[in-house]
Swiss-Prot record:
Membrane topology, from the record: Multi-pass membrane protein
Assigned protein family: Belongs to the UPF0182 family.
Pfam families from the UniProt entry: UPF0182 (PF03699)
Biased composition regions of type Low complexity, renumbered to the chain: 903-916, 979-1004
Origin superkingdom: Bacteria
HAMAP family to which the protein is assigned, alphabetical: UPF0182
Protein name per Swiss-Prot or TrEMBL: UPF0182 protein Noca_1530
UniProt keyword terms in alphabetical order: Cell membrane, Membrane, Transmembrane, Transmembrane helix
Localization, UniProt: Cell membrane
Length: 1004
């Protein structure tokens, strides 16, 4: 090739100066050092990554990713380099040997003389640099490539092109990339060829005629022909994009797309093919007239047909009757969206909530509300830390988790926090490399509290600045104090060391040089000692340090020479890194969208982090697109840095995978949860053996799997609009709902809550994830939505919506305002506010109770002037219909609401069988006991009346109803007298409540 690139004998020129040689040598040395350092860093990252994957049993994932990316880099990089290099070479090879003398050519002589000595190097360098850019870009397309290669059928077709949905999800993105790549290569090659032709006289811009040589015209015509042909392929693919593009009233095909944009794409496709043929013909005809006309026609058609004509159709055909025109398209969008987000089978029931509780419903309400979680996972975090932290270098998450355990035969909800290592709490003098990475290596244990239970004395102390009164009213299920072992009883004990967690250090070096070496890793202090014990990690997690080469690689990766210098690093050491559970799942399954909230569970004697993994796409035809972050942006959402695939905008979502990460060993296990999901099937084909079958999930693990919050939030966001199935109503926004704003966090959605609620059509309660809707841009309540969150249930994942009538049932914001402005509540809160305490409102819970809706909200108190203060559960507010009750406990609040005692107390005297006397006898005992006795007699009379009616004895039925009414009226009269005397049962103004500790009933 070099002889072809020689134009004239080279002039050796004057001898080079020694100074310039030294400068050149220094520059070359610096470049070599920089390249060597970057190469070593890159290699160290790849090498240690391979060690990490292999140690975790996912070496096949590393191999697949590495070779896929490598092949894409070299294949597409070589394609760009080859096409550009060949075109540069051809442009130079067929340069004109005679160049007419002109000012233009005389000016270009300087550039030709400068380029001539380095022509070959310049050609190779330009081709390689452009190839490297193209190859690097291709690496980012590995997901599309693997999906295209391993994609399968969805089993259904779109409504317009009758293509399997798999074509849009698996094939279309990769085909788009191939066409875009081809167009980019042709554009770069065209520019490169044109520059070379211009430099060497093949293109002469300042001559009046023959501005292009024959070779230049032929080469440029061929490149333009292929480019326009690629554009035709792009128009063909663009047709299919119409079913997943947004920007209109819906995502997907609209009337304008169907009647203007789609025909325009077909016409432009045909014009592009004709234009390409004209460019190819121009190789022989040597005239630019026909190609220029074709290119001009394509450009004008693109403007007229692609932009102006759709605008005319939209403005003059669609706008005057848009609802009717768009109705068929909206109908298809509704059907596709409900399918893509899996909300097509939501059970919607009309629900007309009662506004008052019946006289005989007190015990039923008490039973149904016994499992209401009063311990707010967000607010009690400080209480967890100050009471169970033990040392400043331990911490728990900002928002705690809720899970359920079988404790003493009862299904109980617990608020859980993992006691993780938080190195920011270490003393400044202890913060050296040895301590940070070999001594302070792990956390210890789980802290657990009953979600629905108060401390035994049933009161709280808020007058001590350190809040030591009753540990925030919390009843511990697992902690550091003696006797708090309910979780241990439920699980049979467990490995409590936490080496992998949400707050774990970047890396730790663990392991002893010999079995007789001293343990140096600091463990949780032992009972009765102020000093922590020591331990040594003996799990199989992550990579072994090994010999000098591995130590050098880790030293390079982390920029830390102590890997080579410290005596704590030995051949038996392991390096624990990539320790965040969600990050570990992302790394072994880089095709998953990972849930933002991993939660801990004790399973088979180990602490596991459970993480939900989703398959998402933005290519599901006709389904509505929305930002994933927007849909899950509630008041508890934290920035995690986790990615949403393929983009933040999605229009399809499935909880395809349940993943676990062992908090001690770091072992990651993926289980196929939705085995019918075609996207999961494609990834299992791409990475065989990495995802276990659903049947491999143990019973103990299954007990702790739950419906994921991110999925529920996405579904509730979409269902707020897509519960409307009539196209005209949908277009007009009739009956549109929205997720309410959190009353205490402006601009954020109210988060969903995990509650035990009545099962659909059953008598038992089920563990559910719940939320509410309000009408669009209004504040009253529209509906209550829940989903069965119990993975062991046959009804798992079944969503139920209780749709309220249009009357003004107050929504969360309105209820929060009613609580704050209620005279009795406001007066009581003002009293302890004046004493230096500050009220903090907990979760505002909504739950269906006794054919109505009850709001429950805990109120915490914290010392306003104390930095060490943490919220203490002080009051509970309840609302049913128009009535508000409050008290120190939920039972007290219900008593205050109902005007009766719901718990055990003084037993009423034996008054005989109902019906012995129509006039109720004078009751004895306390007023509350009298009321209970009267209501019990009334309930007995109602039962007797029902039995008489069943037997057809109308006379007895009427007599028993009279007795019941007399007892109810007497009870109401006593309640009114007690209220006027200012003695509400359970009033928080008392120093202590008379009711016993609140112990929840079995919930299932």
């Amino acid at each position: 090739m070099s002889e072809l690139f020689d134009e004239a004998p080279r002039d050796p020129g004057p001898p080079a100066r020694s100074g310039s040689r030294r400068s050149r040598a220094l520059i070359v040395t610096a470049v070599v050092l920089v390249i060597g350092f970057l190469g070593l860093s890159t290699f160290a990252g790849i090498y240690t990554d391979r060690l990490w994957y292999v140690s975790g049993g996912y070496g096949a994932v590393f191999t697949t990713l590495f070779w896929t990316k490598t092949v894409l880099f070299f294949l597409f990089g070589a394609g760009m380099a080859l096409v550009v290099g060949v075109n540069i070479y051809l442009a130079y090879r067929f340069r004109p040997f005679f160049r007419p003398n002109s000012p233009e050519q005389n000016g270009l002589d300087r550039y030709r003389e400068a380029i001539n000595p380095i022509r070959t190097w310049l050609l190779v360098g330009v081709a390689l640099v452009l190839g490297a850019f193209a190859g690097s870009s291709a690496i980012g397309e590995w997901r599309d490539y693997l999906l295209w290669r391993n994609g399968t059928s969805f089993g259904s077709e779109d409504a317009y092109f009758q293509k399997d949905i798999g074509f849009y999800v698996f094939d279309l993105p990769w085909l788009h990339y191939l066409v875009d790549y081809a167009m980019a290569v042709l554009v770069v090659a065209l520019i490169a060829a044109a520059v070379v032709h211009y430099l060497y006289g093949g293109i002469r811009l300042q001559t009046p005629r023959d501005r292009l040589s024959g070779a230049a015209q032929a080469q440029i015509s061929v490149l333009l022909g292929f480019f326009v042909l690629a554009k035709a392929a792009d128009y063909w693919l663009d047709r299919f994009d119409l079913v997943s593009q947004g920007g209109g009233v819906i995502t997907g095909m609209t009337y304008t797309d169907d009647h203007a944009v789609l025909p325009a794409k077909n016409i432009l496709l045909g014009i592009s093919i004709i234009c390409a043929v004209l460019f190819f013909v121009n190789v022989w005809r040597r005239t630019w007239l026909l190609p220029s006309v074709g290119l001009a026609l394509l450009a004008v058609s693109a403007i007229l047909l692609g932009l102006i004509w759709p605008g005319i159709v939209q403005q003059f055909q669609v706008k005057p009757s848009e609802a009717d025109k768009e109705a068929p398209y909206i109908e298809k969008n509704i059907e596709a969206t409900r399918t893509a987000y899996d909300v097509a089978n939501v059970d919607v029931e009309k629900y007309d909530p009662a506004t008052a509780l019946g006289a005989g419903s007190a015990s039923m309400v008490e039973e149904e509300t016994s499992s209401v979680p009063l311990v707010d996972p967000q607010l009690v975090r400080d209480a967890f830390e100050q009471n169970q932290q033990v040392r400043a270098y331990y911490s728990v998450a900002q928002v705690l988790d809720v899970d359920r355990y079988d404790i003493d035969g009862n299904d109980r909800a617990l608020v859980l926090g993992v006691r993780e290592l938080d190195q920011s709490g270490m003393n400044a003098g202890d913060r050296n490399w040895t301590n940070l990475h070999t001594v302070y290596t792990h956390g210890n244990g789980i802290i657990a509290a009953f979600a629905n239970q108060r401390s035994e004395d049933n009161k709280t102390q808020i007058d001590n600045a350190d809040n030591t009164g009753d540990q925030a009213g919390i009843v511990w299920a697992q902690g550091t104090n003696a006797g708090q072992d309910a979780l241990a009883r439920a699980t049979g004990g467990f490995e409590d060391r936490i080496y992998y967690g949400e707050q774990s250090p970047q890396y730790s070096v663990v392991g002893k040089a010999t079995p007789d070496s001293t343990d140096v890793e600091l463990n949780l202090q032992t009972a009765g000692s102020d000093e922590g014990s020591t331990t040594t990690y003996d799990g199989n997690g992550d990579a072994s340090v090994g010999g000098f080469f591995n130590q050098l690689m880790f030293a390079t990766k982390f920029g830390e020479p102590n890997f080579l210098l410290s005596g704590r690093v030995n051949p038996n050491s392991k390096v624990l890194f990539n320790r965040n559970p969600a990050d570990r799942v992302e790394k072994v399954a880089p095709w998953l969208t990972v849930d933002s909230d991993p939660y801990p569970a004790v399973v088979d004697g180990r602490i596991l982090w459970i993480i939900d993994g989703y398959t998402t796409t933005d290519r599901y035809p006709l389904s509505e697109k929305e930002s994933f972050q927007t849909m899950i942006d509630d008041s508890l959402q934290e920035e995690t840095g986790l990615r949403t695939l393929p983009t933040d905008e999605i229009n399809y979502m499935r909880n395809a995978v349940k993943a676990t990460v062992d908090a001690y060993t770091g072992d990651v296990t993926l289980y196929a949860w939705d085995e019918e999901d075609p996207i999961l099937q494609a990834w299992r084909s791409a990475f065989p053996g990495t995802v276990e079958d659903k049947s491999e999930i143990s019973d103990d693990l299954l007990d702790h799997l739950r419906y994921p919050e991110d999925l529920f939030q996405v579904q509730r966001y979409q269902f707020a609009r897509y519960h409307v199935t009539e196209p005209i109503d949908f277009y007009q926004g009739n009956n549109r709902w929205q997720v309410p704003e959190d009353p205490y966090s402006k601009g954020k959605f109210q988060p969903p809550y995990r509650l035990f609620v009545d099962s659909n059509g059953g008598t038992d309660q089920v563990f559910a994830l719940t939320s509410v809707y309000v009408p669009y841009n209004k504040n009253n309540l529209a509906s209550f939505v829940s989903v069965n969150a119990d993975a062991t249930s046959d009804q798992y994942g079944q969503m139920q919506v209780l749709e309220l009538p249009n009357e003004q049932t107050p929504g969360p914001g309105q209820v929060a305002n009613q609580f704050a402005t209620d005279p009795e509540v406001a007066n009581e809160l003002a009293q302890f506010n004046r004493s230096g305490a500050r009220p903090v409102y907990g979760n505002l819970l909504t739950l269906p109770i006794n054919d109505g809706l009850m709001y429950v909200q805990p109120v915490y108190a914290t010392q306003a002037l104390s930095d060490s203060s943490f919220p203490i559960l002080r009051y509970v507010l309840v609302k049913y219909g128009n009535d508000i009750g409050f008290g120190s406990t939920l039972r007290d609040a219900l008593e205050n609401l109902l005007g009766v005692s719901t718990g055990p107390g003084t037993q009423p005297p034996d008054t005989g069988q109902p019906g012995d006397n129509e006039n109720p006898p004078p009751a004895t005992g306390t007023v509350a006991a009298q009321i209970r006795a009267l209501l019990a007699q009334a309930q007995d009379a109602f039962d007797a009346a029902d039995a008489a009616l069943a037997d057809g004895n109308l006379a007895e039925y009427q007599r028993q109803i009279g007795i019941a009414q007399a007892n109810v009226e007497a009870a109401m009269e006593l309640g009114q007298k007690r209220g006027s005397a200012g003695q509400p049962s359970g009033s928080p103004s008392g120093s202590a409540s008379s009711s016993p500790s609140e112990s929840p009933s079995p919930s299932s």
